[in-house]
Regions:
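Active-site-proximal alpha-helical scaffold in enzymes
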Residues: 108-136, 175, 209
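Conserved beta-ketoacyl condensing-enzyme motif
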Residues: 19, 53-110, 228-243
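Short beta-strand segments
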Residues: 20, 83-85, 134-140, 175
């Protein structure tokens, strides 16, 4: 029996990788919301002084990455690998953010699951001894996502009632051996669940079945109940996806 597997879809990390530090950077709109106090930095300008939305998103990643390193009292060279992703073609914002780090880089494309995916992979590398310290980094930007998935803002198209608002923000966690925690003890990897959603704007409804299936499988694999957790968080399912 493989002691690193748990149930049907889960894995465990017996060496308990820890989150040494984390940082979150948000856009102006997000800075006015209920999570304002939890952001390390709030941008006053949605373009962050850059020439394009995509460059602005890359700057969000750079800022979150540098803040996380600073909070962990580490230099970039103290890391062994960088896992980063975004919502854009060729992970362009992540690639440009990683360009100046001189770190081994694995680009991820998991949509709203990218932060969880990057943490899963970082914890896997640290737990197995392939890395002593790894960074898990992701970002999104409302304007760059609109251009990628819906309509460029300059087009002036009307948003559908089912279209959620993609967050302008970036988050980074430094995952390492030892430490005081919080620790990553395991992970559950989800499956594709296609319920035939035809509305291309309603991404929340398209993702909701996979989210609930993964959460259900996590409880089953680890023999736990929802009450055992202080908080259960998903990617952005939007209002309709959350209701589902």
């Amino acid at each position: 029996m493989n002691e690193l597997r748990k149930g049907r879809q889960s894995i465990v990390f017996p060496n308990y990788p820890s989150i040494a530090a984390s940082a979150a950077v948000a856009g102006k709109k997000e800075g006015k919301g209920p999570l304002r106090a939890d952001f390390d930095q709030i941008a006053a300008d949605t373009k962050l002084g850059q020439a394009s939305w995509e460059k602005a998103e890359s700057m969000l990643q750079k800022t979150a990455f540098e803040l996380a390193l600073e909070k962990a009292s580490l230099a970039c060279g103290d890391l062994d690998i960088l896992f980063a992703g975004d919502l854009l073609n060729q992970c362009i914002s992540s690639s440009f953010a990683a360009r100046d780090t001189n770190l081994p880089f694995l680009g991820l494309y998991g949509a709203c699951s990218t932060m969880a995916e990057s943490l899963l992979l970082a914890a896997s590398f640290v737990n197995a001894g392939y890395a002593k310290r790894a960074a898990a980094l992701t970002s999104s930007h409302f304007a760059s996502a609109e251009r990628q998935y819906r309509f460029p803002l300059g087009y002036g198209g009307q948003r559908t009632p089912t279209a959620q608002w993609t967050v302008t923000a970036s988050g980074c966690c430094i995952v390492s051996t030892g430490g005081k925690g919080p620790f990553i003890e395991g992970a559950t990897i989800g499956k594709i669940q296609d319920f035939g959603i035809k509305d291309a704007n309603n991404m929340g409804a398209a993702m909701a079945p996979a989210a609930i299936d993964t959460i259900r499988q996590h409880f089953e694999d680890f023999h736990r109940r929802p009450q055992d957790y202080d908080l259960i968080v998903t990617g952005d399912l939007g209002l309709l996806g959350k209701q589902i």
